UniProtKB/Swiss-Prot annotation:
Subunit comment: Part of the small subunit (SSU) processome, composed of more than 70 proteins and the RNA chaperone small nucleolar RNA (snoRNA) U3. Interacts with DDX21, NCL, NOP2 and EBNA1BP2.
Residue stretches of biased makeup (Basic residues): 14-26, 112-130
Per-repeat ranges for WD: 215-273, 275-313, 316-355, 358-397, 400-437
Name this protein carries in UniProt: WD repeat-containing protein 46
Amino acid sequence: METASKPGRDVQPKKARLQTKKKKPRRYWEKEATLTAAGASPGPPRNKKRNRELRPQRPKNINLPKKSRIPGKPQFPKKPREQRNLEPQRNLSGAQDPFPGPAPIPEEVARKFRRIDKSKKLPHSKSKTRSRLEVAEAEEEEISIKAARSELLLAEEPGFLEGEDGEDTAKIRQAEIVEAVDIASAAKHFDLNLRQFGPYRLNYSPVGRHLAFGGHRGHVATLDWVTKRLMCEINVMEAVRDIRFLHSEALFAVAQNRWLHIYDNQGIELHCIRRCDRVTRLEFLPFHFLLATASETGFLTYLDVSVGKIVAALNARAGRLDVMTKNPYNAVIHLGHSNGTVSLWSPAMKEPLAKILCHRGGVRAVAVDSTGTYMATSGLDHQLKIFDLRGMFQPLSARTLPQGAGHLAFSQRGLLAAGMSDVVNIWMGQGMASPPSLEQPYLTHRLSGHVHGLHFCPFEDVLGLGHSGGITSMLVPGAAEPNFDGLENNPYRSQKQRQEWEVKALLEKVPAELICLDPRALAEVDVISLEQEKKERIERLGYDPEAKAPFQPKPKQKGRSSTASLVKRRRKVMDKEHRDKVRQSLEQQPQKQEKKAKPLKARPSALDRFVR
């Protein structure tokens, strides 16, 4: 039997030969000790140990996660507060980040989202309460910084229309705007010729994707106005006075000649509310799920569409009601009357919350902006007025129009549209927080028929016009808010997302009893009720449990509890309390002197109303 000869000393085994041919992998953090020759392939030198000093060293102050005994269960180390502002960590390549940490936030941007006034000092309270207040303030500051940082993601900007040198934008026609914009925006301008069923009232859905319109001769239709896809089209064979979408585009209400009807997006009648008869105007409150109706009989009715019950039926005692709008800020209903007044209503009160004398004649139209700050009214005296709703409801500006405005509408960014006969004028202010300037119109458009309805489309620079000749979609640059909240009103939501949103909205429904002029008052402390409860408690117990107990010195030993020492200690405490009272009175004296130094105003005279 022959045996294979063993390899000699000079002959290497096959396995050893393969190992010598294999090159060591070169890491990208390793640096060459010497420059390689031209054309030579770079690589680590042979038969030399790897230089370990070139590898990045792990910082010593980093807490590594401990290995879990349970397989597959990740553990996340908690970062101590002291290590938040450490020096920037090195990358694997050993280079430092030239811009370590998050990008700085400008103070002006962070102040816009801040809800805590840092200028006010924290009250002197217990240490535990003070620590809680400090933690809450730190959390609010972090939230405001995150909100300011996320604002950078809102890349959309509002549009605008700017003329050339000295050019009046009111003279720019819609055809010129359509030629200047892109194809997608140009498709949003269209006309529907529906003369045989007019005049028309129209309304956009809350997300701004769908359009519902109803003609005076019974024609009712809804469509996706972006894609021009018709959802339903019916003829109710009865006069249609107003139409409104409910909380979504799946339901809409129609005020017909006799009763109020509710339809779905396929045109099927779901409900007929006979208690709401001879309705002239409709308004929907989305956060309360309330449908407000104004009728010829002078009643303002609130219908809860989530349970199908009448919440309140209020008699305005002002005759026929055909002028109504809502305040989006506090959900208060504004009614215009024939005596020139505008009344503000809430379902929790049987009497109006306030009455404003706006015109010498009857009120023809009322509109409130999205912030609830300004109200626009027009009357039979051909006056168009802007009122401030924050204080004493004083008029800010007024303008006499050649023809009285019969319809008014505010956009999301504060533009005011007024329909006068067959002409539509649009005014714009200096900014979103300023009222619209009535001196010079921003845009003007003439229609083929008399205007009977105005509504700005949410999140689109489009104004919907309903007139005797049909429907017109007008382009208004800078009218809408460019960025929308995807969790609140998402124009691109699917059917499942809409269903989930409906469930959440129903769970978060605001009760009708909470509608008031100032919604911030709900978060304030009811001092009157608190004092009344405290008084009743004192009468019931016979003493005040919260009153400060009189000072009782503690007994001491070794003769220090004698009568003289006890009296001395009581007197010392009384002197301290007296000094505190004197100090407080001295601090209040300068304020009283300043009030006395102010000159008293003269008594008002009956002739002051003639002074301009």
